[in-house]
């Protein structure tokens, strides 16, 4: 069980297309154990039928499909274990990377969208100043189609653009207040955005949109699909693996709200939390503490994890630390429901 859990944690963290296990020639026990991996991790089982250790391969295989790679496999090799060598550590300077990112954003018209499990928070930035903020309540775990996820995100970007385009007049300020007020209906926000266009012309096109999403994001594509937030869609979709990949279109849709040459970048919310902390520290008297990167946990609807490496970049790996097996010995805690704070189970 310890062996399986270690492999499960490695796959949940790093993903990949292949795991090579090297065993000593003649080690019958190790060979027999490795021969159980395909069955234990359910490589030949359909995604919607996998359980236990097999669930980690759902995310890994979706990533591989999105990247045009083959499904995950185990490869067992009988040979002498290679001697591990460590390359000389290169000098790093993540601090410069974090400071450069801020300097590049000065003067730009930007929209940041923080998608969470209970709300979406949106901010509009112009010339380095916050000019519009919006909070939108939602419950993605109860949604039954990808369109229900995509449409509010697109609407939030449109609303922020409209708010950023308004002149500083009493009439415009009233319209802006109504549009950004928490709890206003989707129809009312659409109507307000239409009014902005009718009275003041087409809203500005953004220089960039940044989105953090509570799932695995690789190369600006949402590719996980096993979190609590998409539970309702998994339960109601007749073919979830055709429905879920439609989220990958979100970047293309958001680009329509940017100027020519504008950019949309998407990342996991835990990664963006770590990046935000790193940038803030890089501009403080404690800048040296982030020279080699940052690792951070976030507490929201679920446990999030973010890692910024020593170059100041977000590694393109699943990093599903919330999914890792952390306590094999606590058998009494296994009896509790995953939503019980005493449980060591996750809902997968």
Predicted segments, located by residue:
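Glycine-rich phosphate-binding loop and adjoining helix at the ATP-binding site
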Residues: 3, 11-14, 29-81, 135-154, ...
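Active-site rim beta-loop-alpha module in soluble metabolic enzymes
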Residues: 335-348
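Structural motif
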Residues: 21-27
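Juxta-kinase regulatory segment immediately upstream of eukaryotic protein kinase catalytic domains
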Residues: 69-100
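Short linear interaction motifs
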Residues: 90-108, 189-193
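Short glycine-aspartate micro-motif
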Residues: 20, 110-114, 206-210, 265, ...
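Gly/Thr-rich phosphate-binding beta-strand-loop-beta motif of the actin/hexokinase/Hsp70
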Residues: 98-132, 296-312
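Active-site phosphate/ATP/adenylate-binding loop shared across adenylate-forming ligases
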Residues: 115-119, 124-131, 138-161
């Amino acid at each position: 069980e310890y062996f399986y859990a270690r492999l499960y944690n490695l796959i949940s963290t790093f993903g990949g297309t292949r795991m090579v296990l090297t065993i000593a020639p003649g080690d019958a026990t190790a060979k027999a154990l490795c021969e159980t991996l395909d069955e234990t991790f359910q490589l030949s089982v359909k995604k919607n039928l996998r359980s236990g250790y097999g669930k980690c391969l759902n995310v890994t295989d979706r990533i591989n499909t999105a990247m045009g790679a083959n499904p995950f496999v185990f490869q067992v090799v009988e040979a002498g274990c290679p001697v591990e060598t460590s390359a000389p550590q290169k000098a790093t300077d993540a601090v410069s990377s974090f400071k450069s990112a801020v300097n590049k954003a000065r003067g730009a018209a930007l929209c940041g969208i923080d998608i969470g499990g209970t709300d979406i928070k949106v901010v509009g930035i112009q010339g380095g100043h916050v000019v519009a903020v919006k909070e939108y309540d939602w419950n993605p775990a109860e949604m039954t189609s990808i369109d229900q996820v995509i449409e509010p995100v697109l609407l939030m970007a449109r609303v922020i653009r409209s708010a950023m385009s308004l002149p500083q007049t009493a009439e415009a300020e009233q319209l802006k207040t109504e549009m950004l007020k928490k709890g206003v209906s989707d129809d009312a926000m659409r109507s307000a955005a239409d009014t902005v266009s009718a009275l003041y012309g087409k809203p500005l096109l953004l220089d960039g949109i940044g989105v953090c999403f509570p799932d695995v994001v690789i190369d600006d594509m949402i590719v996980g699909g096993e979190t609590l937030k998409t539970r309702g869609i998994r339960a109601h979709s007749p073919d979830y693996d055709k429905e879920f990949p439609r989220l990958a279109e979100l970047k293309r849709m958001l680009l329509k709200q940017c100027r020519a040459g504008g950019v949309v970048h998407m990342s996991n919310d835990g990664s963006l939390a770590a990046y935000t902390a790193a940038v803030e520290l890089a501009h403080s008297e404690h800048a040296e503490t982030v020279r080699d990167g940052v690792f951070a946990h976030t507490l929201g609807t679920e446990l999030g994890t973010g890692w910024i490496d020593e170059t100041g970049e977000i590694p393109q790996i699943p990093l599903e630390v919330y999914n890792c097996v952390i306590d094999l010995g606590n058998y009494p805690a296994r009896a509790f429901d995953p939503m019980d704070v005493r449980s060591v189970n996750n809902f997968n």
